[in-house]
């Protein structure tokens, strides 16, 4: 339980990509769509709803959900909220464009049709009808090409790529992400644009899933190097030329990249590098989102897990205890995962009684939450705990007999 399987962890990458379906690269140039609408889709409002694309993803990842791959039918309240905002954004655009005219031009009719197809695709994804979503998106991308509209093409390719990844069609997802990036670059988007780096991170995650380690490592390195260089450049810019949101967006994307690489390194038993990246990601998340933010707590727990695997049980306990305490105070939605990780670390440290108590508490919470995968992991942890207890008792008996 102390360390989720790599498949379980990488499932979160898939889940995040599904969530990213709402987010086309914001900085794609050449918006001839007469729809500021495409770009308005990437600007949800509200507290945390976003200082950046990463904020939402860092909040929802609860990177044990790194754990459970949720299909679109398992939508959360925030998914529904995002969809409502998305629909309202399109509705406002359509009204402003077409509400004052009785007759529409051919171009406006095509725009209407494209908007409707994308709305249908998004709704189909949300309710889990992935085949239907795929059909709508293929029709939408053909229409976008017919209109020679780069923004619409990029947005639709991005949705198609995310959908392909959710469906496990990794080769197809790779091609679609590359196609979207190609259109962005040909339109003049700079290579250090956050949207391009975000797609590069998704590609690196695909390569990691496919065990294409050289490509994965190159991709992760490109993301972190590009973002760090960009942040260095931003330090020299006058304050008025860069908004707090842009600065935060870049920094949180770096945190997300470091976290993704840390999980990749941990899965390959490269724990020193994983600890380094987790510490840096945790620092960013604490500074940008606060000590009690759900993502901060998950990163504390993840770092503790890797420290535990390195044999640094005492340091691991410091981090995981803090995560559990803050999570309890904040009402963390996946407190059972934090408790399970702490139970595993205590078990490895030989504190069997306390470990058993936490495992049972975590198991009860997991049942309440209906987290079947966590329940399975926790039950495996309890079995391991029983085995360790029995082994210790047998060893004690043998020692007594020798005396």
From Swiss-Prot:
Annotated TPR repeat ranges: 154-187, 297-330, 336-369
Cellular component, GO annotation: mitochondrial inner membrane
Sorted UniProt keywords: Cell cycle, Cell division, Electron transport, Membrane, Mitochondrion, Mitochondrion inner membrane, Repeat, Respiratory chain, TPR repeat, Transit peptide, Transport
InterPro entries in UniProt: TPR-like_helical_dom_sf, TPR_rpt, TTC19
Subcellular location: Mitochondrion inner membrane
Domain of life (superkingdom): Eukaryota
SUPFAM superfamilies the UniProt entry points to: TPR-like (SSF48452)
Keyword NADP in annotation: no
Transit peptide: 1-67
GO biological process: cell division; mitochondrial respiratory chain complex III assembly
The family this protein is said to belong to: Belongs to the TTC19 family.
Assembly behavior: Binds to the mature mitochondrial complex III dimer, after the incorporation of the Rieske protein (UQCRFS1). Interacts with UQCRC1 and UQCRFS1. Interacts with ZFYVE26 and CHMP4B.
Function: Required for the preservation of the structural and functional integrity of mitochondrial respiratory complex III by allowing the physiological turnover of the Rieske protein UQCRFS1. Involved in the clearance of UQCRFS1 N-terminal fragments, which are produced upon incorporation into the complex III and whose presence is detrimental for its catalytic activity.
Protein name per the record: Tetratricopeptide repeat protein 19, mitochondrial
Lineage: Eukaryota, Metazoa, Chordata, Craniata, Vertebrata
């Amino acid at each position: 339980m102390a360390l989720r399987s790599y498949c379980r962890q990488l499932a979160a990458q898939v889940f995040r990509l599904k969530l990213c379906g709402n987010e086309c690269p914001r900085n794609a140039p050449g918006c001839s769509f007469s729809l500021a609408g495409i770009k308005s889709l990437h600007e949800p409002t509200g507290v945390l709803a976003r200082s950046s694309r990463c904020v939402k993803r860092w909040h929802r990842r609860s990177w044990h959900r790194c754990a459970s791959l949720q299909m679109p039918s398992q939508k959360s309240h925030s998914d529904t909220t995002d969809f409502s905002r998305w629909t309202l954004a399109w509705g406002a655009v359509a009204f402003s464009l077409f509400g004052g005219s009785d007759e529409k031009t051919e171009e406006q009719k095509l725009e209407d049709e494209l908007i409707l197809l994308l709305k249908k695709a998004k709704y189909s994804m949300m309710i889990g009808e992935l085949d239907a979503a795929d059909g709508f998106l293929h029709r939408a991308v053909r229409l976008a090409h017919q209109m020679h509209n780069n923004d619409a093409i990029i947005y639709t390719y991005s949705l198609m790529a995310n959908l392909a990844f959710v469906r496990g069609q990794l080769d197809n997802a790779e091609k679609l992400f590359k196609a979207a990036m190609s259109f962005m670059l040909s339109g003049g988007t700079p290579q250090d644009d956050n949207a391009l780096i975000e797609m590069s991170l998704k590609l690196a995650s695909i390569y990691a899933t496919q065990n294409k380690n050289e490509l994965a490592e190159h991709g992760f390195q490109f993301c972190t190097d590009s973002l760090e260089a960009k942040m260095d450049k931003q330090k020299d810019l006058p304050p008025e030329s860069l908004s707090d949101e842009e600065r935060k967006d870049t920094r949180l994307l770096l945190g997300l990249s470091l976290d993704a690489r840390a999980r990749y390194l941990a899965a390959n038993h490269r724990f020193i590098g994983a600890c380094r990246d987790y510490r840096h990601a945790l620092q960013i998340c604490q500074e940008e989102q606060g000590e009690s933010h759900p993502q901060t707590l998950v990163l504390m727990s993840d770092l503790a897990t890797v420290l535990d695997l390195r044999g640094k049980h005492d340091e691991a306990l410091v981090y995981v205890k803090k995560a559990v305490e803050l999570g309890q105070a904040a009402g963390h939605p996946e407190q059972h995962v934090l408790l399970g990780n702490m139970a595993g670390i205590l078990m490895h440290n030989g504190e069997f009684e306390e470990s058993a108590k936490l495992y049972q508490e975590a198991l009860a919470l997991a049942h309440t939450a209906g987290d079947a995968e966590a329940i399975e992991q926790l039950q495996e942890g309890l079995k391991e705990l029983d085995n360790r207890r029995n082994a210790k008792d047998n060893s004690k008996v043998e020692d007594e007999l020798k005396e």
